[in-house]
Regions:
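N-terminal beta1-alpha1 ligand-phosphate binding loop
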Residues: 1-10
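A cross-family phosphate/adenosyl-ligand binding-site feature
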Residues: 9-64, 68-69
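Glycine-rich beta-alpha junction loops
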Residues: 22-23, 113, 152-157
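Short glycine-rich anion-binding loops that position phosphate/pyrophosphate groups of nucleotides
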Residues: 24, 53-54, 78-81, 156
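Short, Asp-centered acidic motifs that coordinate Mg2+ and/or phosphate
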Residues: 72
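Glycine/threonine-rich flexible loop motifs
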Residues: 81-90
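Glycine-rich phosphate/pyrophosphate-binding loops
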Residues: 100-123
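Electrostatically charged, flexible surface regions
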Residues: 122-167
Length: 167
């Protein structure tokens, strides 16, 4: 999902900065790392991982790594839906919330999938094909300050997706 997120971001801008958790953080919610130092490792220019949570990653990026606040924070692409009560457990959604709390337009992206017959494989085709198409109109909208958007791509192949609906 992370490679798909980068591909989507590159369709929107050439000025991409990445800071993500070094390890899987499913179910991390809006937690912070308080019991140990958060370590940052640089992998390339404008590309880091940190030993903390998704929220730690956002805080580290905007507070320490970037020279100025970004125009946009994208979080995801999460494996699975972030709908209903699940959003409260989601590190993906919480990273976007942290960005919004910092006054930055923030969008969480998730790819819904069906586990039946797929094992651990998540088809990110819908997110990959539709990501930038969904984000462009969202970015053109006026948003109230400290607002985040949560996008879920359906469990369909990219060509089976018929369009976009904002709810």
């Amino acid at each position: 999902g992370f490679a798909v997120l980068e591909a989507i971001a590159r369709q929107l801008s050439d000025d991409i900065w990445v800071c993500a958790p070094a390890e899987e953080q499913s179910g991390a919610g809006h937690s912070l790392t308080l019991s140990r130092p958060v370590r940052v490792r640089q992998h390339a220019e404008r590309r880091w991982s940190c030993t903390g949570t998704p929220t730690d990653s956002v805080m580290m990026a905007i507070g320490k790594l970037m020279p100025e606040k970004p125009d946009l924070i994208l979080s995801g692409v999460n494996r699975g839906a972030n709908l209903g009560d699940d959003v409260t457990y989601s590190g993906t959604v919480s990273a976007a919330i942290e960005g919004a709390l910092a006054g930055i337009r923030s969008i969480a992206l998730s790819q819904v999938y069906s586990k039946e017959g797929m094992g651990d494989t998540v088809p990110f085709g819908a997110a990959e094909a539709w990501g930038a198409k969904v984000l462009r109109p969202l970015l053109a909208m006026d948003m109230a300050p400290r607002t985040m958007i949560n996008v879920n791509f359906p469990a369909l192949s990219a060509d089976a997706v018929k369009g976009i609906r904002v709810t």
